[in-house]
A protein has these predicted regions:
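PLP-dependent class I/II
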Residues: 1-252
Length: 252
């Protein structure tokens, strides 16, 4: 289903419903999102849940960035809605909020019939997560959360720095992401495809971007930028991107 720049890339029930067919069994939702960082509000999640009830569908909610939000109380899980127990499959993990990328540790809450089948699949593929990784996960959940708060404060500063810097570059427009660590600026004014723009920035500015088209046709005209780096690196990247964009503006 499409996400629209005009509403900050938030999911809309009407866009999802337009694509439901008699063969549809599952809706996949993601909030906060990769690549946009957008967060879908509770009222819109309720509308999506109502769709699932109307068409008797499961909902798979990927909430890997649920702890990575920039406004207190902003995140809302669709699994917290009434009657969600038998319809929502919720997944989460440790790689983002606890900086445990590569540990391959996560969790799922699902209706019993789904959970039982997932257990069968797990047992015949990887058996289980190694014991020391499980202990690390317990320490992450039960331990002092101050490092997580400090990390998010740093991400907030980096987000603000990057988005403000992008919006100061003529020809680029960028929404302020509500979560995760991605920005998804609109670069369509330069007359290049997102892949051409990303290739040019890598070649001329030594800045690595991901073409929005990698995320589907709706991403054309956008690029994804990650601010999981130092403020000094972000400033340097902005200066280089701005220089190339100024050169492009002279040609458009």
């Amino acid at each position: 289903y499409p996400l629209h720049d005009s509403n900050g890339f938030r999911m809309r029930a009407e866009d999802i419903e337009a694509l439901i067919t008699p063969r549809t069994r599952l809706l996949i939702i993601h909030s906060p999102q990769n690549p946009t960082g957008a967060i879908t509000e509770p009222e819109h999640l309720q509308e999506i849940f109502d769709l699932a009830e109307k068409y008797d569908l499961y909902i798979y909610s990927d909430e890997i960035y649920s702890r990575m939000v920039y406004e207190e109380g902003h995140f809302f899980s669709i699994a917290s809605l009434d009657q969600s127990r038998e319809r929502v499959i919720l997944s989460n993990g440790f790689s983002k909020a606890f900086a445990m990328t590569g540990w391959r540790l996560g969790s799922v809450i699902a209706p019993r019939v789904i959970a039982e089948r997932m257990m069968m699949l797990l047992q015949t593929t990887s058996s289980c997560v190694s014991a020391f990784v499980q202990r690390a996960g317990i320490a992450a959940i039960e331990g002092d959360q101050a490092p997580v708060r400090e990390m998010m404060a740093a991400y907030r500063r980096r987000r603000n720095l990057l988005v403000q810097g992008l919006n100061n570059i003529p020809g680029i427009k960028c929404h302020l992401p509500g979560g995760a660590f991605y920005a998804f600026p609109n670069i369509s004014s330069f007359g290049l495809s997102s892949e051409e723009f990303a290739d040019l920035m890598l070649e001329k500015a030594n800045v690595a971007l991901l073409p929005g088209s990698n995320f589907g046709s709706q991403g054309e005209g956008f690029v994804r930028m990650v601010y999981a780096s130092s403020e000094s690196n972000i400033k340097r990247a902005l200066e280089r991107v701005a220089d190339v964009c100024h050169q492009l503006s002279g040609r458009v």
